[in-house]
Amino acid sequence: MEFFIAMRQPTKNNKVKTKKTKKKVNKKPFNPYKSSGKKKTDQKYGTSKLERDFARDFLEKNGLIFVYQYEAKDISRYYDFAITAYPEVDYEMEVKDGIKCVKQEGQYFPVSFLIEVDGGYFHSDPRVVKEGKLNPMQKHNKFVDSLKDKWCGMHCIPLLRIWEYDIRNNPDYVLEQINNYIDIGYKKKKKEEWRKKPH
């Protein structure tokens, strides 16, 4: 014996009621210092007009040999420019984002010092942004900047940070700073050469 039970189909007047509940979203505030768990393996750098102008007006005009977007592989970060005090070496060159520079991969490039060109808003220049009013992006950039500072300190590489305001308004000051760091690089080079000589 078979029994058939007639199921009532919902109609316009007779709708099947379902209980709808809103899910509570436990949204935690954004923490710029905490990793999101995603590994950035193919991180790309961004090229700004400020970096192009700096390379053209300060580095190329003064005949400095540099790597553009020098990668510190152990922290997966890029420094804007790596300068060497060994210009007499014939380095393999490349063009990166319109900037002619030394190719980092496949050859030895002795770094005398590194340059970071920091925008006033994004890296929170005290002349532009008040310390207490930083947004999460600015806090994250400050954290990354401190990480880069520590990396340079651990590897005994001088780091020159140049603000956008100084590049646009105080070019003589910027040139003076670069020349001071070049002098440091040449002194370091002479000490290394002196150590290698037989005494």
Predicted feature locations:
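Nucleic-acid endo/exonuclease domains
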Residues: 3-199
